[in-house]
Amino acid sequence: MTSYDEEAAINPKAVGNKSSLLKYIIGGGVLAVVGVVAVMVSLQVSGNLVKSEANTLAAQSSGAQRGDRLDLDNDDDLEDEIKEIDDKFKKEFDTLLDNVIQEVNKQLKADLNGGATAGGVNNGGDTDESSNDTDEDSNDSDSKDTDSDSKDTDSDSKDSDSNDTDSDSNGSDSKDTDSDSKDSDSKDTDSDSKDTDSDSKDSDSKDTDSDSKDTDSDSKDSDSNDTDSD
């Protein structure tokens, strides 16, 4: 085998071609390496970009999910607060309603008790009783009548001769229930001073000449027509 110098001396053109080919091969290899490195770098950069974008998207998605969870938590808190306010309002309303009902019941009871008391006073305050009768026979005389119209509880406006149940025309000794059966005009032993038939001893059950029905006031009794005098 000949050396490089010998071959160059014999065929210089061939040697030059080989050198050029070697240069192309080396240059192509370098370019290939550079290209591979560039591709790897670009892939690395692209991968990093993809990872970054993926992380960003993941973060956004996670944040959205966290936001949803927070919103749900806030909704629960809001519902609890609304429920608490509603329960408090119901309790206050029920308490107020109970107080109003109790107050109304107290007022009704007070009104009923007041009505009963007023009725008792009216029933007990009857001034038309036989014990308080101011028209006593012991003080009754035609000349000295102490039963004036001002004290007469039976007003004269209601007295009429037509309604007189103890009229002088009908007051005979046989029908007189005021112990007139023993009284006579000529032998009158029932004097005013000894008259024992006072209204204070007359009970309401036997007294048929009560003040409530007595329409024969003294102002219309005259001595001339009085046949039933004490």
From Swiss-Prot:
Biased composition (Basic and acidic residues): 141-161, 173-223
Entry keyword annotation includes Secreted: yes
Compartments in which it is found: Secreted
Keywords: Glycoprotein, Secreted
Chief place where the protein resides: secreted
Tissue expression pattern: Component of the acid-insoluble organic matrix of calcified layers of the shell (at protein level).
Name by which UniProt lists this protein: Aspartate and serine-rich protein
Organism of this sequence: Lottia gigantea (Giant owl limpet)
Lineage: Eukaryota, Metazoa, Spiralia, Lophotrochozoa, Mollusca
